[in-house]
Amino acid sequence: MWYLVMSRSLAEKEADKQSNYEAHRQWLDDQHRAGRLLFSGPTTDGAYGIYVMLATSLDEAKALAARDPHHARGIRQMEVLEWRAHRAFRLNGPTIAETEKMAQSE
C-alpha cells in the first residue's frame, strides 16, 4: 500500500532543519534507492516536505518515516496517511488491483 507522509516544518526548529538537511537528504536518497519512495519534495512555500512511501502497513510506514533524521530529531512533525494511489506516471499505468498486488509483494 502507498502512504503519504506530510512533514511539517516547525518555525522554532528552522536552524536545526538547515543544519540537519544533508542527513535528511541522504535518508531520502537511500529510501528512493531501496524502492520505498515514489516521490519526495517540499511544498513551494517550504512549509511541508511530502513523500509517497511504499510499505506493507501503516505501522511500517510510520516506523520508516520516524527514521527520517528530521523526524527522529524532532525538527519536523510528521503525519502518515494511507493513500490509495490509482495511477502513477501515465494513463495506461498499472490498474488499482495491479498496484495493490505490487504493494503486497514488497
Predicted feature residues:
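Conserved, structured core segments of small domains
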Residues: 1-106
